[in-house]
From Swiss-Prot:
A Pfam family matched in the record: MFS_1
Segments on the Cytoplasmic side according to the record's topology features: 33-48, 98-101, 159-164, 218-224, 284-285, 363-395, 452-471
Cellular component GO terms held in the UniProt record: plasma membrane
Listed name of the protein: Putative multidrug resistance protein MdtD
Protein's organism: Escherichia coli (strain SMS-3-5 / SECEC)
Gene name of the encoded protein: mdtD
């Protein structure tokens, strides 16, 4: 990339900055949840909605982000994304109630949903094709550093300042990024087809109301009749989308995608697998603080080995898949992650705290291998003309399943804790033990899906997408 013009390198730095902001925010909040609960006068069991409101909004808005960038221009949308994200951060810091915080997090989610896909699109437009891989590696590296710094930085700010500062630090950074975007980034546009607004609204309603219904009466305060109504609305919306997309070449996501067996299996496995994995970043710092009495900063530091394990495995995951095949790798890592989850709970409750960093490092390695394998399995056999649509659907499902995972984790805590969980409670560790056992069971379930994956171990098939025409 040394031969790129200075203006292009500055534009890549702006995109990298956006990736860093978005990835940092996905992890920095987790460590602060118990302190937020105390400050807002809420039960810690309700605080999972702080994560769900953000991730679910990202899932809902992702399908529209690429079309908006093509229609309005990448600079305009990237600038808007940073402004919305920064305003959301300000409103989060000013929130005095949980409901205000949830609305502010949703606004952050709108910005976050546009930031990363539009950033990828920007790189595609400003960098020559032969340098695209190097440019993407450069801009995504800060996105890998964000999760590494997030938990510890969040814990540090909570312990020595207040939870408000995990949002306030975004404001000066966001202002600088917005100004730099206006000054340095070109406003590329492309001719677009008509946006499938009907399909978008049906999917958005279906995802949102079903996730809200899943939270149940304990989280939302809704009556059983109201929850049943939400479920009915969500199911009807998704069924209507399927009818809308059938034989519709302009549908948001073509049903032709599901003619590819590996895509169908990979998407189902990714959805189920990330529900279980999505529980862990939320539950681990909450358990360390409320269940074991760790300080926020100490709990944040304990999350670093998990991120390091994840980053370390990315270098060899292709060799592992080529050696053993997708089916063996996915079944083994799914069951392995379930066992590591049980190991973490056991060592923590036995008081073997010095072992926890090694267990979390192992958890990161296993999780990273499974994530990478799920992603490539899902997309590897799609024909070229469906690859972009399939990737967008996978990205949406990834965010949706993580929001559902956090919702289920909060639901389990509420079920076993009867709304009474605190550091001083004598039953707290028992509540967490039952919750972790349930999580381990849920994490293991996708192994049944992955057992149906063709056991293809040939390198040219395992890491390359076949070019076929979609008939």
């Amino acid at each position: 990339m040394t031969d790129l013009p200075d203006s292009t390198r500055w534009q890549l730095w702006i995109v990298a900055f956006g990736f860093f902001m978005q990835s940092l925010d996905t992890t920095i909040v987790n460590t602060a949840l118990p302190s937020m609960a105390q400050s807002l006068g809420e039960s810690p069991l309700h605080m999972h909605m702080v994560i769900v409101s953000y991730v679910l909004t990202v899932a809902v808005m992702l399908p529209a982000s690429g079309w908006l960038a093509d229609k309005v221009g990448v600079r305009n949308i990237f600038f808007t994304a940073i402004v919305l994200f920064t305003l959301g951060s300000l409103f989060c810091a000013l929130s005095g109630t949980l409901n205000e915080l949830l609305l502010a997090r949703a606004l952050q989610g709108v910005g976050g949903a546009m930031m990363v896909p539009v950033g990828r699109l920007t790189v595609m437009k400003i960098v020559p094709r032969e340098q695209y891989m190097a440019a993407m590696t450069f801009v995504t590296l800060p996105g890998q550093v964000g999760p590494l710094l997030g938990p510890a930085l969040g814990g540090l700010l909570v312990e020595y300042a207040s939870w408000h500062w995990i949002f306030l630090i975004n404001i000066p950074v966001g202002i600088i990024g917005a100004i730099a975007t206006l000054m340095l980034m070109p406003n590329y546009t492309m001719q677009t087809r008509r946006f499938d607004l009907s399909g978008f609204l049906l999917l958005a309603v279906g995802m949102a109301v079903l996730t809200l219904a899943l939270d149940g009466s304990k989280g939302t305060g809704l009556s059983p009749l109201a929850i049943a109504g939400l479920v009915a609305v969500g199911v009807v919306a998704l069924v209507l989308y399927l009818l809308h997309a059938r034989n519709n070449n302009r549908a948001l996501f073509s049903l032709k995608l599901f003619r590819t067996r590996t895509f169908s299996l990979g998407l189902a496995g990714s959805f189920a697998g990330r529900i279980g994995s999505g529980m862990l970043p939320f539950m681990t710092p909450v358990f360390l603080q409320i269940g074991l009495g760790f300080s926020p900063f100490h709990a944040g530091l304990m999350m670093i080995p998990m991120v390091l394990g994840s980053m370390g495995m990315k270098r060899i995951v292709v060799q592992v898949v080529n050696r053993f095949g997708y089916r063996r790798v996915l079944v083994a890592t799914t069951l392995g992650l379930s066992l590591v989850t049980l190991l973490f709970m056991t060592t923590a409750l036995l008081g073997w705290y010095y072992v926890l960093p090694f267990v979390l490092f192992l958890q990161g390695m296993v999780n990273s291998t499974r994530f990478s394998s799920m992603n490539t399995l899902t997309l590897k056999d799609l024909p070229d003309n469906l690859a972009s649509s399939g990737n967008s659907l996978l990205s949406m499902i990834m965010q949706l399943s993580m929001s559902i995972g956090v919702t289920i984790a909060g639901l389990l805590l509420g079920l076993f804790g009867s709304q009474h969980v605190s550091v001083d409670s004598g039953t707290t560790q028992t509540v967490f033990m039952y919750t972790w056992l349930s999580m381990a069971f849920i994490i293991a379930l996708p192994a049944f899906i992955f057992a149906r994956v063709p056991n293809d171990t040939h390198q040219n098939v395992a890491i390359s997408r076949r070019k076929r025409s979609a008939q």
